[in-house]
Amino acid sequence: RTILQRITLIAAQNQEDGERFLSLGLKRNQLAVTGSLKFDISVTPELAAKAIALRSQWASRRQVWIATSTHEGEETLLLEAHKELLKNHPTLLLILVPRHPERFPVACELTRKAGLTFTQRSTGEVPSSGTQVVIGDTMGELMLLYGIADLAFVGGSLVERGGHNPLEAAAHAIPVLMGPHTINFKDICAKLAQDDGLITVTDTASLVKEISTLLTDEDYRLYYGRHAVEVLHQNQGALQRLLHLLEPYLPVRGH
């Protein structure tokens, strides 16, 4: 409470967080709910052009799904799902992107053990028509790789890691799937799910079922992709609201 008495303003990302500060003794006139800065992302024309070019190189006549920010215990489930999906979608390509660099070689080994053919993004090798998996073992390319995919699974959510950011996938207007463990992005996932911008899966079987439907039903796929990006757009503006709140505290700029 002593610390809160010395604070002039708190900008909370949602009402729930704001209420927590009020319960600690913050005065209501010192609280502003700005929304989450994570919504303030977009796909630039340059990025979109790069993604289109890479898609034409990698999979001009193939469907592609991406699984990102995966953790120990998830890659095995995702590779099992991919093997199952290949039975009805034999040309399907999976881009598998582990969360941490130390899991890049592990993902390669798990893919090899699963009996799937793969390439590594870091080598620059272009996937052939027989390549079933691309291991996304580079840094800083996630937004580009999302741009290649028809749908995305965001990891840390089938295992109890709290989930990772679904908005980077949503920005590309593609369907977003996550497991049940999304506490790290509780508010964002709730907003997406409420407006049909997020599909929740619980295991390999439900993942296969949902992805199969998305791959075979274009209207269903476009519906979820459109709703995901609409939720993103509807919740943008946090950065501008924050800058507006900070303006009175910043020094006046000279002419």
Regions found by a protein language model. Name each.
Residues R1-H255:
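Nucleotide-activated sugar donor-binding and catalytic core shared by glycosyltransferases
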